Amino acid sequence: MIKLVFRYSPTKTVDGFNELAFGLGDGLPWGRVKKDLQNFKARTEGTIMIMGAKTFQSLPTLLPGRSHIVVCDLARDYPVTKDGDLAHFYITWEQYITYISGGEIQVSSPNAPFETMLDQNSKVSVIGGPALLYAALPYADEVVVSRIVKRHRVNSTVQLDASFLDDISKREMVETHWYKIDEVTTLTESVYK
C-alpha cells in the first residue's frame, strides 16, 4: 500500500502572489506545530517512509517506529539526519519509479550486509520532497494532506504546484479533521482515497 503523507501552508509571497509553502531550508515553513507532528507520527508509524535526500537531511534524527528509505544519487555520499544518522536503506530514482509503478525492488543498507525486498504488500508512506509526491500520486492508495493556515505570511524555499492539490481534490475525501492551534494557526487534515 502506498500512502502520501505531507503538509503545506497556503500563503502569499512578498509580491502578493499565492504560493503553497512546503519547505524552508532544512525545516518547516510554519515552525513546530505539536498537533501536526502528532498527526504525522500517527499516520506514518509502522510504515516504511520513503523520502528524498533533502527531506531526510531535515530530520533531527531517525523517527522511531518507522523505517527510512532515501531516494538519492548513490554515487554521492549518503545523506544523513541532523544528528548524523544513516537511513535504513538508500535507493535510486529509477528504483523508486519501479516500485511505485507496481514493481518489486531489492534495497540494501550501508549498515547491513543483507538486502531486503520491497513489494506491493509493504506499507509505505511517501513524505516528500515534491518530485517524489508528484510521481507517486497516480499510484497512491491513500493521500493524507495537512493544510496549515497562518494569519501571517509564511516564508518558504520549496513550494508545491497547485495542480498537484487539484489532482488530489478529484479523489474521494473519506475523512477530515479541523484543529484550532492558537490565535494565528489552524490545521486541517484530510484523507483521500
From Swiss-Prot:
Binding site for NADP(+): 7, 22-27, 52-55, 73-77
GO molecular-function term, one example from the UniProt record: dihydrofolate reductase activity
Domain DHFR: 1-193
Keyword annotations from UniProtKB, A to Z: Antibiotic resistance, Methotrexate resistance, NADP, One-carbon metabolism, Oxidoreductase, Trimethoprim resistance
One of the Pfam families matching this protein, by short name: DHFR_1
Domain of life: Viruses
E.C. code: 1.5.1.3
PROSITE patterns xref list: DHFR_1 (PS00075), DHFR_2 (PS51330)
Pathway annotation from the record: Cofactor biosynthesis; tetrahydrofolate biosynthesis; 5,6,7,8-tetrahydrofolate from 7,8-dihydrofolate: step 1/1
GO BP annotation list: one-carbon metabolic process; response to antibiotic; response to methotrexate; tetrahydrofolate biosynthetic process
Uppermost EC category: oxidoreductase
Reaction it catalyzes: (6S)-5,6,7,8-tetrahydrofolate + NADP(+) = 7,8-dihydrofolate + NADPH + H(+)
Function: Key enzyme in folate metabolism. Catalyzes an essential reaction for de novo glycine and purine synthesis, and for DNA precursor synthesis.
Record family assignment: Belongs to the dihydrofolate reductase family.
Protein name: Dihydrofolate reductase
Upper taxonomic lineage: Viruses, Duplodnaviria, Heunggongvirae, Uroviricota, Caudoviricetes
Gene it is expressed from: frd
